[in-house]
From Swiss-Prot:
This is Ribulose bisphosphate carboxylase small subunit, chloroplastic 2. It is found in: Plastid, Chloroplast. The gene is RBCS2. The keyword Plastid applies. Keywords: Calvin cycle, Carbon dioxide fixation, Chloroplast, Photorespiration, Photosynthesis, Plastid. GO terms for cellular component: chloroplast. The keyword Protein biosynthesis does not apply. SMART domains: RuBisCO_small (SM00961). It comes from the Eukaryota. The basic functional RuBisCO is composed of a large chain homodimer in a 'head-to-tail' conformation. In form I RuBisCO this homodimer is arranged in a barrel-like tetramer with the small subunits forming a tetrameric 'cap' on each end of the 'barrel'. One of its GO terms (biological process) is reductive pentose-phosphate cycle.
Amino acid sequence: DNCIRMGPVSSTYQDNRYWTMWKLPMFGCTDGSQVLSEIQACTKAFPDAYIRLVCFDANRQVQISGFLVHRPPSATDYRLPADRQV
């Protein structure tokens, strides 16, 4: 719909929905510090990459949350909410 109304619309990291996994999923993890330490280790190993955290519901077997936890310092695609437009 946006492409029809606005012409070609280009985004950056969102275009590719396939992300490389850092390690095996942390099924049964109940300690948030484990998750934070894995995020820290991944950021240290890949400082110039987007890092995304994805959370799943084990009972329903669906994704319940997913968001970026690290944006590389070299990224220039961020805009303040007031400066964003479609």
